[in-house]
Every structure is written in C-alpha cells, then in structure tokens.
C-alpha cells in the first residue's frame, strides 16, 4: 500500500465484566482512503478516543458493535464524519443489530450505509481516484 499506515489509536478500557470495552481502535490512512474501526467498543471507548485528541475523521467508518445503541454516539460521529458506514451484522440476529438510533445518526450524516446482512461481503480498498467499494451477496445464509 505504499505510503499507507495502520495505527492503533486506542487500546480499549479495562473492565471486569465487559470484554467489548477491550476492543482496539484502528485507523488506516492511505492514498484515497481513510478508515476507522473501533471494534465492539462502547460509549466509554468513544469518549476516551474523543478525549485523547486523536484525529478521528475518516472516509469510511466500520460501525461500532454491529451498529448498537451502546456506541455510535452523535458526539463521536460528529468528529468522524464518515462518507460511508459499514455495518457488520447477521441477518435477523437476536440482538436487533443494527439499532434504530445509530441508523438514524448515520443517515443524518448523509453517509452511504452498507450492511453485511443486506449487501453481503463488503470490500473497501484504496484506489488512485478515491476508495473502491464492492459488495458480494452470493452465499449469504438466509437462515443466519
């Protein structure tokens, strides 16, 4: 990827009972693409990232915790300002992911929203003229 970088910008928050809070926050920067992934980190992880002073703006944001209401706060998203939001979630999952609150916040940003339960495999790659977005639906397990 030439001059691209992948950086751990947050190492999570240690807790006794919530392993989601240990999620790493990763930032990729390359020609034509910036990407932010906060794993399953929840509101407290987002607050720590905001307080850290890290540069959070990204073209593409992988929605935290499958698009859960436990994260993806308005304050955090206002700093990220993604053009594209990727949501990894199973079709008809037991948790109701993605939740309506984050979906409304993503829409208010005007971001393109892509979901694995609807579009299948999501591939984002740097391209000379920006990012390349591809989806692949074949093979989605309708019963999952």
Q: Where in the sequence are the language-model features?
A:
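Cap/insert and terminal regions of metallo-dependent hydrolase folds
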Residues: 48-121
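Core dinuclear metal-dependent hydrolase active-site scaffold
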Residues: 1-60, 118-144
């Amino acid at each position: 990827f030439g001059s691209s970088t992948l950086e751990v910008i947050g190492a999570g928050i240690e807790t006794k009972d919530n392993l989601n809070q240990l999620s790493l926050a990763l930032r990729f920067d390359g020609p034509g693409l910036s990407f932010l992934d906060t794993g399953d980190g929840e509101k407290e992880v987002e607050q720590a990232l905001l307080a850290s002073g890290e540069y959070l703006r990204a073209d593409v944001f992988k929605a935290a915790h499958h698009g859960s209401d436990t994260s993806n706060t308005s304050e955090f998203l206002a700093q990220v300002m993604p053009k594209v939001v990727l949501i990894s979630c199973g079709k008809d999952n037991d948790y109701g992911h993605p939740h309506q609150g984050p979906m409304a916040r993503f829409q208010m940003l005007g971001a393109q929203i892509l979901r694995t339960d609807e579009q299948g495999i999501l591939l984002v790659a740097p391209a000379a003229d920006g990012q390349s977005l591809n989806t692949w639906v074949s093979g989605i397990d309708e019963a999952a």
